[in-house]
């Protein structure tokens, strides 16, 4: 389960919910995995061919870098050198990325956090999968990754089956203590490489394993509708 911080980052949460309401994330793929950094999705779908098809996006939103990019948080990916460019893509922080992401590019907006150890265990298992480039894959060899005559199919991808809001109560975040972003007013650090970039396309193979269908359950900390 993921708790969303509606009151702290209302613009971002409402944007995320808008994509959910439009079923934009249904059957989307986890298209980027960077060890000890981030696990990213929300940008592409597999429609029977490679490269993946981009999810249709709404207008970019205002950045809200109030909270810190610590392990277990979910944040919005965006274009490099463009603070207010987030649209549909999100990422989970696999470790404490506050130093590299809280002040860089205007700060990356954290808008929720994983609330259970079981939830993070699933994310860590996906992050530990083999990769083709930065795309996590299952039952797909390195030789297949480099063979341009062979493409992965749906069985080789990590798919987000659906995202469901299970609690819209505005008081659900009352007992949470998200870490504040105290670095945003500092001089920006050099952009880390790699950095979550929504425009970074993926080609090559993708993953799936026991986690072929990954359901993200959102609890509106709503601060939400």
PLM regions with names:
Residues 1-202, 206-209, 218-223:
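Cross-family detector of peptidyl-prolyl cis-trans isomerase
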């Amino acid at each position: 389960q993921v708790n969303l911080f509606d009151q702290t980052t209302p613009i971002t949460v409402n944007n995320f919910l808008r994509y959910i309401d439009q079923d934009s994330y249904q059957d989307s793929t986890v298209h980027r995995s960077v060890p000890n950094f981030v696990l990213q999705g929300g940008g592409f779908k597999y429609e029977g061919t490679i490269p993946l098809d981009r999810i249709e996006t709404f207008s970019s939103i205002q950045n809200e870098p109030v909270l810190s990019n610590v392990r277990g948080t979910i944040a919005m990916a965006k274009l490099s050198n463009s603070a207010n460019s987030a649209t549909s893509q999100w990422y989970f922080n696999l470790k404490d990325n506050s130093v590299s992401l809280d002040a860089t590019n205007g700060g990356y907006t954290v808008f929720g956090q994983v609330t259970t150890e079981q939830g993070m265990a699933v994310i860590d298992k996906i992050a530990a999968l083999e990769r083709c480039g930065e795309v996590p894959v299952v039952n797909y060899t390195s030789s297949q990754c480099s063979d341009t005559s062979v493409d992965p199919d749906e069985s080789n991808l990590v798919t987000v089956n659906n995202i469901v809001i299970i609690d819209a109560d505005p008081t659900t975040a009352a007992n949470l203590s998200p870490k504040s972003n105290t670095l945003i007013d500092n001089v920006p650090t050099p952009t880390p490489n790699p950095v979550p970039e929504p425009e970074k396309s993926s080609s090559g193979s993708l993953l799936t394993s026991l986690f072929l269908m990954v359901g993200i359950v959102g609890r509106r900390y709503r601060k939400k509708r």
